[in-house]
């Protein structure tokens, strides 16, 4: 059996891994991951914007010092900041979520939260890769993302409906907050 690697397959695998991880860690930790992801989104865009501004204003000094800050460097810094912020907040952020364990209901909620987390992470990665501000309508026309969207119906759907995918986890958190409260 020959499997062809496509963007759709990668997206499906990404969703499967994140959903599986959410089922393993459970509802409470999944909520922490979503919260950390929203905070990391803001931090990433803030730090990335500051670095872009600094590199534009100080490009002569930076070049003299032998420091090259190009778009690839900024992209790498943004991805690193995004990942590190999520990990730090989820592990050390002081966020305490404690819902009553309700068995199958909690498992179902963890799966739904996993799906929402995967969507949020992916839409954030698309935004960072496109080097755009958050929820920028130009996301559908940026060359790197346009290429992916042309090759993948799933990516095109996520990019086209970025506002939905970005708000979905928050809406799910609100809806599920009434289930299993202590």
What do the PLM-derived regions correspond to, one by one?
Residues 1-182:
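Alpha-helical transmembrane segments and their juxtamembrane interface "caps"
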